[in-house]
Structure formats: C-alpha cells, structure tokens
Amino acid sequence: MGPKKGKRSHSKNHHHHNNGNNNNNNNSGGGSSSDILYTYSQDTRILLFKVILTQNEEIICMVIQIAYGLPGLPKISDISRDLGILILKLPNRTIRELELFLESKNIYFREDQHINYLNEIPQPTTTTTSPPPPPPPSSISTTTTTTTATAIEIESSSGLTSNITDSTEIQLDSTTTDTKTTSTTSTTTNNSSDSNNNNNNNNNNNSNNILNFPFNCQNKSKQKRPISKEESFNKMVQYNFDLGKIFDEFTREVLLDDLKNDLKIDNIPIDNISISPTPIISPVFQEYDLFLMDSFIILCGQLDNVKLTLEEFKDYYKKYKLLNQYIEDFKDNLINDFLVTVEILASWYIPQKDYSIVKFINCFGEMLDSTIIESFSYIFNKTIKKEDDWSISFIQAALGSNEEFKRQVMCLNDELIQDRYDQSLYSIMHPIKFDNVREFILIYSRDENYFEPQEFWYLICKYDAIAITQHIINNNIAEEDLSKRSGKTYNSNLSENPLEINPLSLLEICSANFSHKIASILFQFYDFKDSMPTRFSLRGVFKPTTTTTTTTTTTTTTTTTIDKDEKDKENNNNNVISQQFQYFRVLDVNCYFNDVIKKRAPIFIDLMTQSNIYLNTEVGEGSDENVDTHESIYSFQNSTEYLAINSNSIHRLKRSSISLLSKVLEFNDRDTLISLLKNLTQGGCTLCKDLIDEKQLLITISRPQYHQSIQILHQNGYTIIPKYQLRDPYIFFAGSKQILQYLLEIHTNSLSETIDIRHWIQAIMSAGQYSSETEFFQYYPKIQELSLRDKYSRTLNILELQYILGHIEGIEFLLEKYLDFTKPYHLDNQELLEIFDVTFVQKKDIRTEESLKAEKDLLEQEENEKKRLKEKRKKEEKEKKKQQNLKQKSLITNNTTTTTTTTPIPITVPIPTQTQTPTQTPTQTPIPTPIPTTPIPTTPIPIPIQLTPTTPKTPKTPKTPKTPTTPKTPITPKTPKNSTLDKQTISTPKTPPPLSVNTTPITPSPPPQTIATTITTTTTTPKTTKTTTTSKIPTLIIELNKYDISIGKFKFSRKDEFIIGRGSNGTLVFKGIWNDRIPVAIKQMHKAFNPLISKEIEVLITLTNKNCNNIVRYIDQEEDDMFVYLGLTLCNGSLQNLVEKDLEINLISTSNNENNNNNKLKNFIGSELRLLELIKDIVYGIQFLHQQGIVHNDLNPRNILIKDDRFIISDLGLSKMEVTSSYSFTMHAPTGQEGFHPAEVLLEKRKTKSVDIFSMGCILFYLMTGGQHPFGDKFFRMANILTDKPILEPLKHNLVACDLISQMISKNESDRPTTENILLHPFFWNHEKKVKFIDASLNLFKDSNGLFTSKLNKLINQFQDTDGVNTTSTPFLSKPWNQLIDPTLIEHITNKQNQLSGGSSIGNNNNNSLTLSGKKFYFYDYSQVKDLVRCIRNTIQHHKEIQRLISQSPSSSNKQEVLDCLESQELVLSYFEEKVPDLLLFLYQKFKKHLDSKSLIYFNDLIIK
C-alpha cells in the first residue's frame, strides 16, 4: 500500500511481503490487486548511497540488471542517470536479496552485516494500488505491463535459500521484444498449481547463472498475453501522466481526478486506488549535491545521539573507505546555490519532526552556510508552532551550528526583526507569537541589543504570551529577592533588566490590545486599586475626577488638557516616550477592531470594571484601511501588514482624535459597547466629553445599520451617578440634526435636563459648526444672550438651541421670546478665546486652515515687532551719532582758535597699580610725567571712567560749561543707552579719547602723582590713555552689551546661548540682567494662557521679599503686549544635576576601567557638619513656606537649586506654567513618577503640609546616598510607597538618619513630624544638645516624685516593648557595659564619684548605693542603662580630674588612648558614642513614646510629642 498523501512513510511501513496464498486474493473484478508499487523510501535511498560508496562497477551493474531485468549490462556512463530510477523500481524484497547476495561475496553495506529493519517484513495491505515512478528516458516504450512474480528461491554461495513472494515489475518494449520481465519468467495464473510450476522453472534457471545470481535475466516465455484494466491504468500513469515530475499540488489533483474519471468509464473499482505522493526529489538525480545531502541526512538518522558529531558519524561508518571523499565532495558542492531545493528537502523532514535533520545539522553544521540554515529555519518558522522536545533540539542545533545565523536571530534590533518577519525568516517573533517559553529563553539574551520595553510588551500583549509573561515577572521577582538576601539594593538598569517596565505602563499596553489574559497576570502580582493615579490615561485607564459645571472649573479643566497636549508634543519632538503616569502613551498604534478583538474587548473591559479601573476613551488616530475583520490576522498567513514594528507610529506621541467609544460604535458590536458603557458610567464619565470631538462619528452612526448601537447608547440601564447628573450626557449630538431628531424620538425625558451652555458651545465648535475664530465672533453678537448664560432650564430645549446655533434667521425671534431671563454678564474676547482655544488652537487634528493661518500671523506679528524694535534702536543710534559729530566739530573749531593761549591743565591721575585698578592688565606701566605736546584735534568718545584729582596743589576744576567754548575742561557726552562695547573701548592713535575728569575734588591718602597735561599731546598719550581706559571698564558693562532686548528693568537676549530653560506654551527662561547690575533668570510667559498671571506673580514677589534665604526669590516682573517677564534668582544648577553628573562620570570610568576620584556631590558636601547645614537649608525653606500657609506639593531633587554653594528651594507654583529646567514653577497635579510624592497625593486625597515632609524625607535619603531612593527602583517604587515598604539599607550605617527619614516618609501622614520637630531630632543635635539630653535623662532617673517608675526602667533596658508581665525581650545591652569601656576608665570614674561623695568604691551590688559607718558608697550596675547614662554624665562633668588621676596611676597598655579621650567634653562624648553608638537614639525613642507631659518637662525643647 502506498503512503498517504502528503506524508512520508517510515521505512518499516514500506516493507511489504506477500505469501503464496495472498497472491490469489482479490483476483476477481478486473484483475489482481496484489501488484504493489513502491515509492522512494529511506530504505532504498540508503541502499542507493551504499552502492555508490562501493565504487564497484560489477555491483552497480548487477543492481541495475536486477532492477530492469535486462540481459546486458548498461554502460557506466548511464549509471549516474539510472541509479535514481532503479531504486524507485526496486521492491523491498529485492533489497534484501541484494544484501544477502553481496554478503555472500563478502561485501557489506552495514557494520553489523544486517539491515535489522528489513528482517521483519510486515504483511502488505493489498487493497490499494499506486502508480510506479516513470521509467528512465532510455527505456520509455509505447507498451508496458505489470505482472506478479509468485515465489522465487534465493540461492547464495553460503547455501542460504529462502522463498520470498513479492511484486516486481515487468516492462515491455515493442522495439526489442514483445515482453521483458523484471524478476519472473512467466505470468501469474489463477490457480496455485500453475504458480508452483513456474517457481520450479525459475529455480532451474537460477542454477545455471554464471554469477550465481538468484534471478534469471532472460525471459524464456515469449508469448504475449492480453492487457488487463489494471495494466491499462499503470500505462496511463507512466506515459501520459508522469506525476513524478509534477510539483504543483493543484495540477496533481486535477490529473488524479481525470484518472479516476477514466477508470469509472472503464468500470474499474476506484475506492481503493490512490496515487502515491510526489517524491521530494526528482527521480532523475540531476542535482548531485542535493542527493548527497539527502543521503547524509538519512545516514545521520541511523545513529541514536541527537547531538551527533562528525567524528561519531565517521567512526560509525568507518568501513566505507570512500565516505571521507564524499564528505569533502559534499563540502565543496555547498557553495552552489540550491536553496530552493534545500527548502523542498527541509519541507519533508521538518513538518514530520524527524530527528534525522537535527542530527544532520549538529553533525555537518560547521560546513553549512548560513543561507542553508536560514532555509531550514524558514520551513521551521512556517510549519512548527507550539514547542516540544524536537523543536527545542532543532533550535539548539541551528543556533549552535552557525554564528552568523545565531547573531541574526538573537539580535533584538527592531528594524532587523521587522525585516526578518517580513521575509518569514525565523526570529524572536516565533516564540512570542506561539508563547513558547523554552524557545524564548534560548533566543533572548540580555547581552545582545535589547528590545525597547514598550515594543516588546506590545507584542506580548498582542499575542497573549501568558507563559513568557509569567516567566519574566517571576524571574524579575526572583532577582530582586536574591539582591535583598545578599544585602544589596535591587537596582535595575537596562543591562540587568532590559525588559523591565512599570506595571501601570504594562497595563496600558494591555488596554491597547484588550489583552485580558496578560492583565489578569498583572492583577495577580500587583494591586492596582490603591496605586492607580487619578488621570492615568492608559488608552487610557484612569479614575474620574469631580468636575462641576461652573465657568471657573470648566476653564481649569480645559487648561489642563492644553498643558497635557503641549507636553505630549514636546515629548514627541524629542523622540522620548513620556514616563509620566497621568499622560503616559506607549504605542500610538491604530485603533483596530477585528474578530479577535471582538472576543477580547468585552472580557478585558469587564475585567477592568471588576477591578474598579475605569477606561478613558482616548486611543490612537485610526484608519479604516488598517482594519482587518478576519481572525487570520493573528495566524501565520497574514504576516507583515499588521505587526509594523518599524512603523513611525511606534514612537508617535500625538494627541488622539478618535475615541475608543467612537470606534466601538463604528465597529457596531453590541457586547463591547455594553461593557464599555458600563465601565464609563460606573466611573462617573459622561458621553459629552467622551465624544465631543467626533464630528465624523455623527455622520457615521446616523446610518440605519447603527440603530441598535444608538439604542444601547441611550438606554436607561447605565445611569449617571448623582454627582455627575448635572452635565447633559447628549451634548455631543449638538452638531447633528439627524441624531437630535432620533434622540427626541427615543428619549424625550432627557429634554427636561439642565443644559451646560459652555459644553454645548464647545460641542458645536468641535463638530465643525464654526470652523474659525473669525466665523465664531461673526455670529457671536447674535447669540450672546444665550451663550453668556451658564445654564438653561427646560424652557429652552435642546432642539430649539440647535435651531438657534444652526439657523441665524431664527435667532432674533427666540431672543425676544426668552428675554425674561436674568441679565447675564458680558464675556470679553479673552474669555471667549479660552473656550475657542480649547477646541481649535490646541487641536492640531481638527484645526482648520483659518486657525493655522491665525497662528502663523501671530508668529509673524512677533517677528515684526522684533524687527521694529531693532530698526528703532538703529535709528536712535544713528541720531545720537549725528549729534556727537556736531559736538566734535564744534570742539575742533574752538581748539584751533585757542591753541596759542592755552595753559597746561593740571589733572591728577592715580598710578595704575594692580591694587588700585583691579581690572588692569599685567602689562600696564605707571603713567609717566606728561610732556607738553602740540595739539591734535580729537573726537571725544565717551568713556565711563572717572579719574579723581587728588593733590591739594591742583587748582579746583571749574564746572563744566553748558557750551563747549572753553578749552579747559572738555565735555563728556552722556553714554548712549544702546551704545556697544566696541564703540566705547576702541581708540586709534589718530583720535585719542580725552580723559573724563571728576569735578568733585577728593583728597585721598597717600597722594598719587600729579600729571600736568596740555591740549597738545605726544604720540605716547594715546597709548597711555587706552591702557588706563581698558583697565577701568567693569565686567558688568561687557555683560550688558551682550543683551539686545530691554523690557523695563530687564535686559536679556533671545539667542540660543542665553536660553537656560524651555517649557510648554512657548515659555522660555533667559539669562539676563535686572536693574543694570543684578544677574537674574528671566522667565518669559504668554499672557494668553493665563490672564491672571500678573496677580499671582505679585503675590510671589511679596512672599519672597520676606527675609528667607532658602527659597528662590521672585525679584520683579515686566510685561509687553504678548508676554509677562518674571525675574528669578540665577542659580548654578540643581541637586539632581549634581547627582546625574556623578552617575555619568562613574559610568564612563567603569567602562574605561578607570578609578573615579572626582565625585562632585561628595566634594560639594565636604564634611558631615556641612551636610547638616545643607539639609537645614532645605528644612528652613519648607518651614518658611509652611509658616506662610503654603504647601509646595512638588518637592524633588530637580527643585533643590544651588546658589552660592547652598541649597535653595524653587518651583513655588505659577499657574500651571511648566518649564523643563531648574527654573520650573508648577502647581499642577504632581505626577508621582519619580517617587517623591506620598500615597495620598497618588490617590488624590486631601493634601496637607505633610506632603512636603514626605518629599523632603526622600530628598534627604537621595542626598545622603548619592542618588538612591528610599523606596527602591522605579519598577516597584509606586507599589512600595502605597504599601509602606521603604528600603533603607543603603543608610543603615547611620541609624539616626534612618530613624528621622523613616518618620518623614511614613504612609500615615499623621505620623510625619513637622518641620519644627524635624529640627529637634537627634540627627541635628550638636555636642551641647547631646550633653543637655544626658543631663536631662539623669535628672529624670533621680526624680523623687515617682516619674521614673520601675516599668519605665524596664522599658529602657529592652529593645522592644512588651505588653505581658511574663514576656521577655532582647536587652538593649548585649553584655555588661563595663566590658564595652576601658577598665582603667571605669575604675577611676568610680573612685572619683566616691571621692566627691566622701565614700569609696566597694564593687557591684544589687543597689546603687550602700551606707556603712555613716558613709555612703556608690557603685554602678553594669546591666542597667540608667547607670551607663550616669557614668557618661559623671565622666563628662569631671573629665579633667579623671584625666589627672589616670595620669598619676601606674602605666597601662592603653593609658594614652584613655587620656586623649578625656581632653574635652566633646571627646568624652565621642568616646562613649563609639563604644555604645545607638544609646542616645534608643533613649530618645523610648522617652518620646512612653513619657507623659510631666516627665517631658525635664527635656524642655529636646523632645516634643
């Protein structure tokens, strides 16, 4: 029986054996069906290759002779062509006979001398017939018949005889003989007796064979016989339908159908007739290299080891001497291009998951080119889906065989992955697509180019790769646990965790794909209920906020949207994916709906609803051409169009214009729409905002097929919660008359609701009713009576208002009808623009040509204003220059007429030394005594330097006359306001500038040299004058002349080199000068975005004018027609800049294997004392704000600026105007992305001053650890804040700081200390306060009023508090404290104490004192903390006496060390702090927790509860 179509039969399934009885079965009904035709099996191919390896001409010819039954031997030249054909015609019986015969000649094909899988020949199934392959070209004849050989006796030289029955072939050639037989000499008869006679005749003939060959090649029966219908069938297959050469499956099926139709006509049974599949390799072996590869694959399959090596292969087949030659031949032929044929070969083995090809790749992989491995993997990628042991073995073999292939597959560059995916080549897409974890682990490597996390997780969610997600999350958690167990801080980075992503961000990507399976896994690991921010725009997931319908609230809401949009645009320009929680957008992909999404979306949305997470309707801008409604988009057939990894939209962060709700309506899926409406309405959303921009939707859903969706949209099953019911849910229908009419028909009750007119106007403009600002104001006067009112009752229903806004002719009538309304207030153009800007100016996707032109005109107006100011300055300079020339000409005339009568003018010039003129150059020399010279006409150029006359002998300088007629004192013109530095400093020898003389006589000491000068000067005068002038020019003048813009008291330049910050809405920060002398940062803000900004700035200026040096000062403000300018303190950077620079330097040093000693933060901090002062700068700044009733609400390292090597606080808030630099002042809702906001901010609860305390605690940790965060890495930071799980291990060496910070960052805001209490913490105690605390503690211990109880004494000796009487706790002192302190010191402290009290030391006892003979003796209980405190206090108080006693005592080994620590009280305290480091903090914590108000009196201001 032939193999089934499309599958390859294993070798043992092809070994058919017929006995004599079976030969006669099924002979009725048109002939015998026992004529079994064999296909090209592995057995025959193995034999073929072994025959070739023998290189024995006689054997090869015998094989051909056996196959054809020809009397003559073929020529050797025909062997290469005929070998493939003869094996196709060789039955398995003949294969066995040939092996037995050759074994008798001591020629072996196998090492074990047997072909084991041929020994057990299964019984054949003779119900089907398969056509034989075509005969060789040389033997094709016009007639061919097939008959059956019954029994043949095989005889060998060893006496081996066997009776084997099988079918062979007989070919008839009309040109040579009538009939030629293949393996028999007679035809089969219908009875067994005839068959036996024929067998006997065959045996007799075989005995006469010269070669002792078991077959007689001569056909002694020459008689012709009639051709049966079965033979006619075979003849058609062989000559008319050569299926062996047909590779097209369609053509093959057509031919098969034609054959069956012919057989029906001839009344031949066709139920059991089938045509065997086309052989993989053409029967004629024209491609020798492919034949070798196929043979090697089969030979490799005979070995058991899957990871087969070439050495093992050669050793196994070592008897075949020529095998190495064929291996080398195979290696040389690999350079030929036969990839198509290789793919055909691979398409046979790989779909069957045959281990032969795995063994072949492992064995010969080093010889195979990467293109061949790519061909194998191409078939693997197309045919294999789910992983198993075979697929893993195949991938391991392919990756290990060729480095180039491995590099291509394991490279995670998105462009390369896209390219391979487009070509259907194997890549990491295969394990992701079919969720194969083991395969993913093999391919993914952190050492290679890492995947962009957003792109990777997008693919994971798209294909619902659950197993891979579970593996990555578990692996990440395991790594973190391992880091914690090893005592390290878990610090993820791209090299360690390249696929790490914030859980909230991953949930957003899930929402983009409606991947409920991945979202369910996330919910198992993370609790999003408490960690979800208020406006988390996933696609977007968010919690609703209360929005009232007042004018102020609406304006604020729209302004927030504008800021959000501007921020997205800025991120888009910088190609940076925003990581902010409110406005995070990952992949702005097209919103598509297909059959897969149809199943996914309702489940995902219901999962979000059950988890109390509500969906925002914003998604990416969609396109109908990308919508595929076929489920096959997730199968292999559709490959490239949908994925689009390399699409530019992957990083596009533009604002959405098509909402999720609109796409669901267009998709018209009932289940998805119901789930979405349920989620939105439970979250407090209303449709008026969700669909306000959807003008195209209004047209789309008016069609009849959307009737059901509209009914669902307006049914009563999804009511709005009460606090949102004031907003009309149908405002978005304002622009569509058809939908309004439909609304009136199905839901008339909605007309009685109150209408928010501002929402309605926004909807009208968004729907395109007014496409430009001009058109809006053109119609405004007609409708202002309506548009100026906040709300309208049922009196003016929706349809009437629609009529008014759409039909101008009815406006006057309706206005007269409703004039009894209360008189409205008038909105000015600015307020109307706020509404207009929301729907036009800031929405690029719906902006019209008019609005774009208006924006362009605004920019041109600004440029023209700049040009106008520039021209004005030039004109002024030109006019001033003209006036100067006139004055100079007048001076020249006067000087010429009075030359002969001129007397020297005594001028006192100080000797230009470096002490007197700090700005002079080192090359300057003292001015020599002037010599009278001839006069030279000069052009006076103003120099802003005054030379002071200092000698009393010099006569008083007369006042400058009004007219330049006297030659005694030249007039100094006023410096032009806009004169440049070049005009002030350049002097030429021809026109030296005159000296400017101060008219006020001053007599300094010591007197400088006096220099007499006349109008006539020498040639040295210009040089001297120039030198003196240059040395006196202040640096400030140089700075002033760099700034070309003057606004009030501000001077600055808009050149890029002077820009130190940029923000949204065109906000810029420049470096400039205020009042011509003070450097400031000048912030330029648009008036249009906040008309009340000037008032807010005035408040901030008033606030910061108060005496506080720890906050940024708001110096002054100026404004022009377009901008407001705010002057701020100019700083040198921020704490974040300082830390980030260190991180960059460390990274570079690590990569270059260098030691980095240039730690900027460490150098900036310096000593511990300076660190305390820097921290106090921050605390004092926050304390000042809190005293003024201000909550900063956005403290982070970026807002801690550096000025004069001290910290000051910035970003005090300025009307949502955000700047991305150190000059950032915002009061918008904090993002929380960096982890500097407490849980109540993230959950949008009431914000108090404790918010700043939490942020300050995080900043202190950040400062003291060089940039680390108290809640760990960003991946878990949000979750740790919400679950109150700080990670303070990096600061565990400083327990006092840990205690303070842990209080400041407590989740419970009531547990956080105030700024006053922070400054009282032991962390800020100096030496005096520590001594004061010890004294107070000792006084408490001595209290006689019962304040110090035994219970309190027990508490201060235990680490933990115990509630029960019998419970025990770990003692604070691990051993007696005398073992911690030097014995010599203990002894002398005790002696000194008893000397002072008049007693002596008698050692330890259960009591603290003992009275003997009227004397009181003191001693210490070394297990008691209070005695340790008493010892410390006594040592501090009497350190000099104890030092003296020790110095007089016999010397000891550590005597000098003890003496050194007794030099001062501070050293004594340091000594005990080193021996018992946690004592003061321990007592502070115990007293603060357990002391009542009476006991706290001892501590005054040291402890405040």
UniProtKB/Swiss-Prot annotation:
Comp. bias regions, Polar residues: 159-172, 978-989
Composition bias type Basic and acidic residues, residue spans: 562-571, 862-882
PROSITE patterns, A to Z: KEN, PROTEIN_KINASE_DOM
Biased composition (Low complexity): 139-158, 173-209, 548-561, 896-924, 944-954, 960-977
EC numbers, comma separated: 2.7.11.1
Protein kinase domain ranges (all copies): 1054-1324
Molecular function GO labels: ATP binding; protein serine kinase activity; protein serine/threonine kinase activity; RNA endonuclease activity; unfolded protein binding
Chain spans, region Disordered: 1-30, 121-211, 548-571, 862-1013
GO annotation, cellular component aspect: IRE1-TRAF2-ASK1 complex
Basic residues composition-biased segments: 1-18
Organism domain of life: Eukaryota
Skewed-composition ranges (Pro residues): 925-943
The protein's name: Probable serine/threonine-protein kinase irlD
Name of the gene this protein is made from: irlD
